[in-house]
Amino acid sequence: MSELSRVSVTALKGVGEAMAEKLAKVGLETLQDVLFHLPLRYQDRTRIVPIGALRPGQDAVIEGVVSGADVVMGKRRSLLVRLGDGTGVVSLRFYHFSNAQKESMKRGTHLRCFGEARPGASGLEIYHPEYRAITGDEPAPVEQTLTPIYPTTEGLTQQRLRQLCQQSLAMLGPESLPDWLPEELARDYQLAPLDDAIRYLHHPPADADVEELALGHHWAQHRLAFEELLTHQLSQQRLRESLRSQRAPALPVAKKLPKQFLANLGFAPTGAQQRVGKEVAYDLSQPEPMLRLIQGDVGSGKTVVAALAALQALEAGYQVALMAPTEILAEQHYINFQRWLEPLGVGVAWLAGKLKGKARVASLEQIAGGTPMVVGTHALFQDEVQFKNLALVIIDEQHRFGVQQRLALRKKGVGGLMCPHQLIMTATPIPRTLAMSAYADLDTSILDELPPGRTPVNTVLVADSRRLEVVERVRAACAEGRQAYWVCTLIEESEELTCKAAETTYEELSSALGDVRVGLIHGRMKPAEKAAIMAEFKQGALQLLVATTVIEVGVDVPNSSLMIIENPERLGLAQLHQLRGRVGRGSAVSHCVLLYHPPLSQIGRQRLGIMRETNDGFVIAEKDLELRGPGEMLGTRQTGLLQFKVADLMRDADLLPAVRDAAQALLERWPQHVSPLLDRWLRHGQQYGQV
């Protein structure tokens, strides 16, 4: 049998060209990819819950008889179906429904449903449940194993993903998926066989310890996390070694431009900015490529340090490229750098995906012709982008870019021979205990001081039952001339459903706040649409912005002083901290309301309590590491510090010492296993030798 890493998903039944394209969107190109695409969480559909025992926020299978189905004309037309089982009654609410669907819900119909119970206008409600009619006297069987919920994308249902996993699991074996951890190593570190771990995680038995799985502490997760962290460690060592052998332009410490820049800035850099600025200046003056990470809390002034680094290269006559992960953020950097550099006589060019036709050609010509400062998005990675003499690359939010993209920029250095220096900025604080393991290939600087004028944000926890009070608070803030964000984080495994939730919230708030100008921004809108809405919000034409978490990185609207975050219990603390950093940028006192769905677990309450107690990102990251709440510890994997499939740096911190030892042993005794591991876990793994 072929190795599954070489078998395309098109070998699976039901996967044609169109489905293969959808699968590629979530990184699934081979059967090995499918098997390593692990569930985000599990649903227990192995038992039927009496309707009378349902609690708000609970996912459950229920069975009952329809007592009525009516089309209700509220803010949105919906179908409301009443379902009872003798212990209680629940309402099923459908916003998108057909006449046939309405007809199938006649009084007396016996239904089995699955969904999340939520408080609604008619008591407990389940929005858009999965359901089927039950006929005959025989009770329909329930599921035998826990039901996996996978990360997905538009047009790719959970049902379809489960079928594809089922087919792939049927082909799983030691020949089709070799175990690259030598037996002796696996024995020393008490690691289970690879195929056992994968089978278990796709189909945990009904009696599996759900809490242990939610925590990520199960032996099967432990096995895969260990292998992934081991591979990451090996790749970092290769990166470091290859970097030491490369040359970069040595840039003398600049005098003239930084002096003018700081004089125009209007405020003195903080002590932390000066210290980190010196570290960067020293690195740039060396003939080896700098590879430095600046960690700075939200609002700590990383961009000013980046500008000082840029001026050192610019004064020496070289080009600088600054790259951001989204067009909104890149455009913000472009505006800032234009404002700062053009008075110094330094030209700034712009390149993003939305730039088309003549404007794009003109921009490419400027870059090739040597325009000193270039700001853009991923578009800067493309082959057709040629620099004249690039000496420094500044990357904002490193975790959004893969290793192959870093490679592409490396190759754009001076004359293609020298390697540009790289300065990477992140506002995702890494606990100090993990920084060394997270970025073994980078030198790290920390900006641990906020510039004067930043006001701490007051954070409060409010239960969803008080939603109307929160809406009134938004109305009052807007009436005072302030602006507000309302962030929807409803459903973590599906961008499509989260966007629908945002649309529903937008309609509800527009209706409730008739006189307030409300905008909507979510991940499925085109970049141009997002940029237009963002610009309106920034200019004050919109007072309230309903958004999904697309706004978490770097958006700067100083007049916004109120943020509402729905379902904060579903997000990692680092991500909540990023979102909260969008307010408190002006002089007004700012507030963040965490609108949660009770009941909160004890750890959930503790975690959200940390957000209330502190505005310090590093403290928050350390506390997150200590708590690791069950099912709620969304650490660095999801917030994007490093794109791990299984491992989570915070959760798996205790594995790191053993992982380092195992990496050493593998390099010394089984070096032939290193490349297959890199290929398995890191796309383009073979290129690690050249990064």
Protein language model regions, located:
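OB-fold nucleic-acid-binding modules
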Residues: 37-67, 182
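Upstream accessory/linker segments immediately N-terminal to the RecA-like ATPase cores of bacterial MutS
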Residues: 72-264, 636, 669
